[in-house]
């Protein structure tokens, strides 16, 4: 049976087109997906991301568990509220999921994981946690909103009680804090996002969600669907699990080597394989592509390089660049001239370093 967020009726009242996304009925757009995309780049938009899975980890051995569970080093988290992006790997070095972990107390950490991997992630985390006597708690009582764009932080901060505004305004990137709403309910506000823009992601009690959503709409924040969320994240060079990487792909094959910490004395799951890949290299790589000709890059299209064939992982029309962009997995080595097979034509594309766009600005290498 398809799941619905607390905002389902609200989305429908706003004219949203609803689609099945990982078993959840979610808004794909409220009208023009391109207009929604531009509004986030230029102003502020709000996303219902309550389909995401929130998992709290409790116990005195949470940090040792996470040193084992995550490819990135949780030892970087020393200040309560700080967050870290990491992959969770299987013994073969494949990505079970990518996630954000928050350090709240030494005996209390929080995960935000993908909706599509909920059951798999919970099973894997519970299995690993049992040896550390860590309690795993799914927080289905919480909803999640993302407010993104250059005006997003100001719009959210203005709705808070004055006693909290200063702390929220000073919140650093990849950090979170808890504040009280006007009805004295706890809001968990983090300066994170999936768009390449500044902004906040907010966890809050289900019953508070509609009130906050409507309050933000009254300030001029626009509702944004998952369609624009996808084009925004692709412009920002952010991976989508299940499309850009999965359990058959290691972080080094998904342009996520920067999230791997081979720190001394930490035997995380999959480390042996990643050490070999670090030393010997990998046979595949993920690259960014930009197409100057008219057309759109799509998942699954064949990519031809000097080193052999690959395929498009994520592809879309970029509203900011007014060109087609994409990620591709291709054989390792210098790709040289690259072409994409579109309707039996080998169309030339350029290899570019991503992100393509960050905080509204086209990155300098894109049109070199």
UniProtKB/Swiss-Prot annotation:
Name the top EC class. transferase
Query: What superkingdom heads the lineage?
Result: Bacteria
Mind listing the GO biological process terms from this record? Answer: glycine decarboxylation via glycine cleavage system
Entries under Gene3D superfamilies matching the protein: Aminomethyltransferase beta-barrel domains (3.30.70.1400), Aminomethyltransferase fragment (4.10.1250.10), Probable tRNA modification gtpase trme, domain 1 (3.30.1360.120)
Give the intrachain disulfide bonds. none
Which GO terms label this protein's molecular function in UniProt? aminomethyltransferase activity; transaminase activity
| GO cellular component terms attached to this protein's record | cytosol; glycine cleavage complex
Assembly, per entry: The glycine cleavage system is composed of four proteins: P, T, L and H.
Concerning its family, UniProt says: Belongs to the GcvT family.
NCBIfam families named in the record: gcvT, PRK00389.1
List the HAMAP family. Answer: GcvT
What protein does this entry describe?
Aminomethyltransferase
Q: Which organism is it from?
A: Xylella fastidiosa (strain M12)
């Amino acid at each position: 049976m398809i799941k619905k967020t607390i905002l389902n009726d609200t989305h429908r009242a706003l004219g949203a087109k609803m689609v099945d996304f990982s078993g959840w009925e979610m808004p794909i757009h409220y009208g023009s997906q391109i207009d929604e995309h531009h509004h986030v780049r230029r102003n502020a938009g709000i996303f219902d991301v309550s389909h995401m899975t929130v998992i709290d980890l409790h116990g005195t051995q949470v940090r040792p568990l996470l040193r084992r569970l995550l490819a990135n080093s949780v030892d970087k988290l020393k200040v309560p509220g700080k967050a870290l992006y990491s992959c969770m790997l299987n013994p073969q070095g494949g990505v079970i999921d990518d996630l954000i972990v928050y350090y709240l107390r030494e005996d209390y950490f929080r995960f935000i994981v993908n909706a599509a991997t909920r059951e798999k992630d919970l099973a894997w985390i519970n299995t690993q946690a049992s040896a550390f006597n860590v309690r795993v708690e799914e927080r289905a009582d919480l909803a999640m909103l993302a407010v993104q764009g250059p005006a997003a932080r100001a719009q959210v901060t203005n709705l808070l009680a004055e006693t909290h505004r200063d702390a929220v305004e000073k919140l650093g990137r990849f950090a979170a804090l808890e504040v009280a709403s006007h009805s004295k309910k706890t809001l968990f506000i983090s300066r994170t996002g999936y768009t390449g823009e500044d902004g906040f992601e907010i966890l809050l009690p289900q019953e508070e969600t509609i009130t906050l959503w409507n309050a933000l709409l009254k300030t001029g924040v626009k509702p944004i669907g998952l369609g624009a969320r996808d084009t925004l994240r692709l412009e920002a060079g952010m991976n989508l699990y299940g499309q850009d990487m999965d359990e058959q792909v290691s972080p080094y094959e998904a342009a996520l080597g920067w999230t791997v910490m081979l720190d001394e004395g930490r035997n995380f799951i999959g480390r042996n394989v990643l050490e070999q890949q670090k030393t010997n290299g990998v046979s595949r790589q993920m690259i960014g592509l930009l197409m100057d000709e008219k057309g759109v890059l799509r998942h699954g299209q064949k990519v031809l390089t000097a080193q052999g064939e690959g395929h498009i992982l994520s592809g879309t029309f970029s509203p900011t660049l007014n060109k087609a962009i994409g990620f591709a997995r291709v054989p390792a080595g210098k790709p040289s001239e690259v072409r994409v097979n579109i309707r039996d034509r080998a169309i030339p594309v350029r290899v570019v370093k991503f992100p393509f766009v960050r905080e509204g600005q086209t990155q300098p290498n894109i049109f070199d």
